[in-house]
Every structure is written in structure tokens, then in C-alpha cells.
């Protein structure tokens, strides 16, 4: 459910829980650019970052299904008896690294297609000139990939909380979709 929600147009961009904003080091520069009438450039950059994440997310489904298929009885008991996000933590431990490896090339291709790296570097360059950003900022591709991964697990956690609060209503609908995907 989380993957389907995030993988559609606006899945990240229109969801305040997972929307990918500019890196913290660029927030001040973005605000200054908005003040100077350059808000459209900032918005275009943020939109492109979120679209790149939306394109990568469908790759998560096979990894999440694989994690469920490989779940041992011990794992299942730990998830059932664990806290409100025990399943999310199980998925994070089992899938974050391989998911990141699948996301990164897609994010990289998406950012190159829309010249995101150049847009980011233009804003980062202006921020650097103003002393608002150091040279050590991460690559935009890795930043977007990490935020995309965070978004997947945030949405899984939200679904898990709903299931634990209403296991009959919400849980049966989601379990049907999960086990339907296992076929």
C-alpha cells in the first residue's frame, strides 16, 4: 500500500509526511532566493527531487515481498509481539541497503533527465557564495535516495499503526493486498 501510494504522481510531493525538501544546509539559501524573486527555481528543484523519488519507489515492492517470504516464525513472533512499528523495523533492517542500491540508479537517471543536478548545483553555488553552505554537502542523488527510503518506511509505519489500532478493519484489507502480492 505504501509503495503504491508513493509511486504515483504526487506521492511524495503532495504528502507532507514524506515530501522531500531541500537539504537543511540549503533552506536559508532557498528562503533568500524566494525573497529575491527566484522562488520558481526553488519550487522546480523540489518538484524534480520528489518526482525522482516517485519514479524509484516501485522498485521497493519486490524487496518488501521478498522480506515477507523470507520471514521466519521467530521473526513473525517478534513483529506480532513488538511495538507499534515492529514490522516497519523488520522491513528497514532487511531491505534498506538493497532498496537504496535499486533506488540510486533510478534517482540518478531521473535527476539527469530533468537537469536536477545542475539546478541543485546552481542553488548550492549561490548558497556557498553567500556563506550559507559548506563544500561538504552531499550529492543530490544520494540525498534524494535517502529521503525516498525514509518516506517508504514512514508510510509503512503509518499503515502498521493503523493495522495495530484496528486489526480487523484495516488489517484484513492490507493483509489481503500483501498476501495477494505474494502469489
Model regions and ranges:
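N-terminal Sec/ER secretory leader and immediately downstream segment
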Residues: 1-48
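Extracytoplasmic
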Residues: 13-17, 44, 74, 147-150, ...
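Mid-length scaffold segments of soluble, non-membrane domains
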Residues: 38-110
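An amphipathic alpha-helical core segment
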Residues: 106-147
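Residue-level signature of catalytic and energy-coupling elements of molecular machines
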Residues: 2, 72, 167
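Pore-lining and gate-forming transmembrane alpha-helices of multi-pass membrane transport proteins
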Residues: 93, 97, 134, 138-142, ...
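A cross-kingdom marker for long, charged
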Residues: 148-183
